[in-house]
A protein has these predicted regions:
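Hydrophobic-ligand-binding modules of eukaryotic lipid transfer/binding families
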Residues: 1-10, 132, 140, 144-145
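Beta-strand/loop substructures that line and gate deep hydrophobic ligand-binding cavities in soluble
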Residues: 81-133, 140
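Hydrophobic ligand-binding cavity/cleft-lining segments
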Residues: 1-43
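Intrinsic-disorder/low-complexity, polar/charged segments enriched in Ser/Thr/Lys/Arg/Asp/Glu/Gln
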Residues: 2-8, 47, 61, 74, ...
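Hydrophobic/aromatic beta-strand elements that line small-molecule binding cavities or substrate pockets
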Residues: 7-9, 61-68, 79, 89-97
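Glycine-rich portal/gate segments that line the openings of hydrophobic small-molecule binding cavities
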Residues: 39-84, 136-145
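A short, structured loop/turn motif at beta-sheet edges
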Residues: 12-16, 43, 67-73, 94-104
């Protein structure tokens, strides 16, 4: 059984600007309240090192592998806890052009594995609010002149 989370925000910025903010991992400590630290590059096959601070939860470090990096459109990675099939999270950031100088940033994550059903309530309580906080913070940063 899979668990899915979804959060989106409309941003008055170009897809290029949103992509720039999203993939400037070194700057995450300056603005991102959810993924408070990130190292690596947005390149397929790259293994990132991310520090996540779930809302009301304990911080964890995880090492997702970039599956897709389509500039100005999509960044997708896969993180695993312990081993494949235990608790896997495939996270996608999609940038959609809306016109009139706006884009929509959509975060979507699908969790699978033996622990996914057991973690469902915790993901709703701690992780989804983190997505929403990150979206709002990214919006503020991308809309700055």
């Amino acid at each position: 059984m899979a668990k899915q989370l979804h959060a989106q925000v409309d941003i008055r910025a170009t897809p290029e600007r949103v992509w720039e903010v999203l993939t400037d991992f070194a700057a995450y400590p300056e603005w991102n309240p959810f993924i408070t630290e990130a190292r690596g590059t947005a390149r397929v096959g790259e293994r990132l090192t991310n520090r996540m601070q779930p809302v009301g939860g304990r911080g964890i470090t995880f090492r997702p592998t970039v599956l897709e990096a389509d500039p100005r459109r999509r960044l997708r990675w896969l993180g695993r806890l312990v081993a494949p099939g235990i608790f896997d999270g495939e996270h996608t950031f999609t940038i959609q052009q809306l016109g009139d100088g706006q884009v929509r940033l959509v975060q979507h994550e699908q969790f699978r594995g033996l622990l996914a059903p057991l973690m469902a309530k915790s993901l709703d309580r701690h992780t989804l609010p983190g997505f929403e906080l990150m979206n709002q913070a990214l919006k503020r940063r991308a809309e700055q002149p």
